[in-house]
């Protein structure tokens, strides 16, 4: 999973 993508959800 792309960690940068997860930060976008935050």
UniProtKB/Swiss-Prot annotation:
Residue spans crossing the bilayer: none
Biological process annotations from GO: venom-mediated perturbation of biological process
Alphabetized UniProt keyword annotations: Amidation, Antimicrobial, Secreted, Toxin
Tissue occurrence: Expressed by the venom gland.
Keyword Secreted on entry: yes
Gene Ontology cellular component list: extracellular region
Main localization (coarse): secreted
Subcellular location: Secreted
Lineage top rank: taxon: Eukaryota
Modified residues (Alanine amide): 10
GO molecular function: toxin activity
Function: Insecticidal toxin that reduces the survival of aphids (A.pisum). In addition, it increases the sensitivity of the aphids to two commonly used chemical insecticides (imidacloprid and methomyl). Does not display any antibacterial or antifungal activity.
Misc: Negative results: does not show antimicrobial activity.
Protein name, as recorded: U1-myrmicitoxin-Mr1a
Organism, scientific name: Myrmica rubra (European fire ant)
């Amino acid at each position: 999973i792309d960690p940068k993508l997860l930060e976008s959800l935050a």
